[in-house]
Amino acid sequence: MSAYRFEDKTPRIHPQAFIAPGAYVVGEVEVGEGASIWFAAVVRGDLERVVIGPGSNVQDGAVLHADPGFPCLIGPSVTVGHRAIVHGAVVEEGALIGMGAIVLNGARIGKNAVVGAGTVVTAGMEVPEGMLALGVPARVVRPAPPPGNATRYRALAERYAKGLSPMALPRRYRLTLRGQDALNPFSELHLRLKREKGVLETLRRAAQGFPLEEEEARPLLLEGLIAPE
C-alpha cells in the first residue's frame, strides 16, 4: 500500500480496509470499514475530499479524483470496476460503475443503479435509483439487475488480507572466481562438491545463464560460488 499525506491533508483508512500493493491513496481520502482498493488504483484527494464508504471496492486501475466544489463521494457497498474513472461525482449505496466507465463532475448515480462498461456519464447527469445507464453519452435505458458485486469483493479482500505474500522471482547469477574453480574437475573444491547432491548441476546451470530460484541459489551463495548479476 502507498498512502501519502499531501500538504495538510492526510488519508484516514479504517484498519479493516484492504489496500492492495501498488494502489495509491493521497491526501484527503476517507476509506471505510471493509472497503477495498485494488492493484494500480489511484485515489487522489488533493483538491477536494474523496470518501469510499464501508464495504465498497475500487478495482484494479480505477481512478477516483475530485475538483474544488465537487467531492468524490462513494457510498457503502459500491463497486467501481476495473479502469473506471469517477471524477467529482456522487455514487450512492449499492451502485455499480462498470469497467472502463467514466462518471464526471457533479453527476449522481442513484442507489443500486448500474453504469454499464465503457459508458460516459456527463457532468451533472443523474442516474435514478435502480436504473441502468448505457452509452456515450450515457442514456438511462431500463431497470438494472441487482449488482451484488460488493459482497463478493468484500469477502475476496478478506482473503487477500490473510493470504497475499510476496515471492522472489528466479534471477540470474554470475560465477565468482571460487565458482569457476568449482567447475574445474581437477580442483579440490570440485571433488568436495561432487559429494553434495545437486550443487554442481545447479552451478553449471548458473554458468549457462539460466535463472535460479531462491532456494536453489542459497547453497551456492553460502559457498561463495555465485553472486547476483
Name each model-derived stretch:
Residues 134-141, 192-207:
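A hydrophobic, small-residue-rich beta->alpha segment in the mid-to-C-terminal subdomain
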